[in-house]
Amino acid sequence: MRIALFVFPAAASVGLIAWAQSESSDQAKPRILSLSHAIHAVGDLDTTLAFYREVFGLNGMPRDFPNPAVPLLTDAPGVTLRLSMMRLPGSMQFELTHFKGLERKPGRAAYTDPGAASIVLYVRDIDAAVANAQKTNAPIVTTGGAPVEITTAKGKARSILLRDPDGFFVQVTQEQPAAGAPEGNVHRVSLAYTMESAEATARFYNGMIGLELSGPSAFSKDPATLKLVGAPEGTEFRKLTGVMPGPNAYVEFTEFRGVPRKKFHLRVRDPGAPAMAVQVNDLTGMLALLKAAGTHVISSKGQIVDFGGGTHTIFVEDPNGMNIEVFERTGSVDTRK
């Protein structure tokens, strides 16, 4: 299958960043099957779980995960893992990981830094969520410290950006829930990431991972968005958006310019490190594509790790500095769930 990046002219000054694929019957090409879960490395699992429970009513059960493959997967000899797999509305899963046994270096990104990540929680009552967050002394990133009015695909909405105890970004947006939405304040979830380059991000996710992302090539200066993320006036941005298969979760990548940026990359074990885990149909083929493109492989010796239960996996770094766990499953269910 031939894949190429194009910028399609839509107007004199506006284009579309997308990928064109030639017709092919090759269904065996390595590609994403599903987003398994978003990942967030934490400094203390109990503290972070308490935050999400007290602020948003989201619950998770902490447990030790004594899998001997973890040190190889994360290239951290001697490390041990305690985790909680939180099940969120819309079949989304959010894995909180607490690594022990080795030194860790916490890190916090600016929202405009490539590699920064945010979980977006859509709520029925944003004022209640903000009040709960203030009780925990959660840092508020949004300029002015209060929700701002933004425009979403569903119309006008109130939104605010804050940090959890590890500095991970949490965007809270109030919107009317769809019919049949789960009970509780949080009724929907999406993911948001900051990218260094829209073109490089499209080459990685569209061209190799097989995730369909697209967006305008032109930059915008929407004041409400800049206020939401705490960016200075004059900052410009553009987005790539798509839907992650599996939970059918909306995902967006934002590139900023006109503001100082520093690529944010932490080791898998470092508190504040974001990641995502994606299931693919052909891990060996996918890894060959990634290595041929010069992708940094994190796992020990750059090799696929047998995780047990028919699961084989590896960690790589995307062009923006974020860690991506890519895995193939041929046997039983992943024991982390």
Describe the predicted segments one by one.
Residues 29, 74-76, 108-112, 151, ...:
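Short consensus segments that form the blades of beta-propeller domains
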Residues 4-15:
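Bacterial N-terminal signal peptides
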Residues 21-30, 33-44, 63, 81-100, 105-133, 157-163, ...:
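Vicinal oxygen chelate
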Residues 68-72, 103-107, 178-179, 221-226, ...:
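A short, acidic/glycine-rich surface segment
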Residues 30, 40-91, 154, 193-248, ...:
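Core segments of cupin and vicinal oxygen chelate
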